[in-house]
């Protein structure tokens, strides 16, 4: 029996995302990795400061513990290495997988493609909005609009270079960094609730197999005969020049 786990990455790259995911990912860094198992405790792994954060149910506040640099928290490692754990991301197929290929390839290698799932793809498969905030509106997940606005501001602060070329960090913005951690945890709450409320009849079995196959093709790419392609470009240029000359002759230069 499989178990759903939910994940969200907060990343930084000096390259704007609008330039394309693969170009963005070439220099991307994973700063935070939020995750949970079904309705269990939500954890946020701070890779920049080597710590793990979660809400203490008794104290009703965020607590943390230090981690060794480069070592996954055992809570996440157990998920990654358990073949019965399905790994859900929001737009994970076209973003998080690509980023992990570059930033944490050794971790990605431990998660077979067959265990990947995507709440955005599930939403699109049922004619629902893909973005998490719009999906939340449709599913009546009454999110605090102020928190959403604040979260977007934190993403702007930490996930992009500053106008002067510098970078905001926990050292420069300690209060905002803690807010950023809590924001990452909040996205997990929305994602798992959306997964629970969405239909799944168009995102199971054969449909998921086809989605996995599509991802493999996208990641692998396809072979191109470069010499033939370049010859086609040259041929097109010659034909266009010939047609332009014919039009010029037929219209007496008009």
Where are the predicted features?
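Conserved "right-hand" nucleotidyltransferase catalytic core of DNA-directed polymerases
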Residues: 1-10, 15-17, 27, 32-34, ...
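Short, glycine/acidic-enriched capping/hinge loops at junctions between secondary-structure elements
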Residues: 16-21, 44-46
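Non-catalytic, usually N-terminal nucleic-acid engagement modules in DNA/RNA processing proteins
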Residues: 24
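Active-site-proximal helix-loop-helix substrate-binding element of RNase H-like nuclease domains
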Residues: 39-200, 206-211
């Amino acid at each position: 029996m499989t178990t759903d786990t939910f994940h969200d990455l907060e990343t930084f790259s000096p390259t704007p995302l609008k330039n394309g995911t693969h170009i963005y990912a070439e220099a991307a860094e994973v700063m935070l990795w939020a995750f949970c198992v079904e309705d269990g405790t939500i954890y946020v792994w701070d890779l920049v400061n080597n710590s793990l954060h979660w809400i203490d149910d008794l104290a009703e506040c965020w607590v943390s513990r230090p981690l060794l640099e480069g070592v996954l928290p055992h809570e996440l490692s157990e998920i990654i290495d358990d073949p019965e754990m399905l790994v859900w991301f929001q737009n994970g197929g076209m973003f998080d997988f690509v980023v992990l290929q570059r930033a944490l390839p050794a971790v990605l290698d431990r998660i077979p493609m067959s265990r990947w799932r995507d709440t955005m793809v599930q939403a699109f498969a049922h004619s629902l909005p893909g973005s998490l905030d719009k999906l939340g509106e449709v599913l009546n997940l009454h999110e605090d609009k102020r928190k959403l606005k604040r979260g977007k501001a934190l993403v702007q602060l930490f996930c992009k270079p500053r106008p002067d070329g510098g970078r905001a960090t926990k050292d420069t913005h300690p209060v905002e960094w803690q807010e950023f951690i809590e924001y990452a945890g909040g996205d997990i709450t929305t994602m798992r609730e959306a997964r629970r409320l969405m239909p799944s009849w168009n995102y199971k079995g054969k449909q998921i197999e086809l989605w996995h196959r599509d991802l493999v093709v996208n990641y692998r790419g396809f072979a191109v005969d470069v010499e033939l392609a370049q010859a086609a470009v040259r041929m097109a240029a010659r034909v266009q020049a010939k047609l332009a000359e014919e039009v010029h002759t037929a219209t007496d230069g008009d």
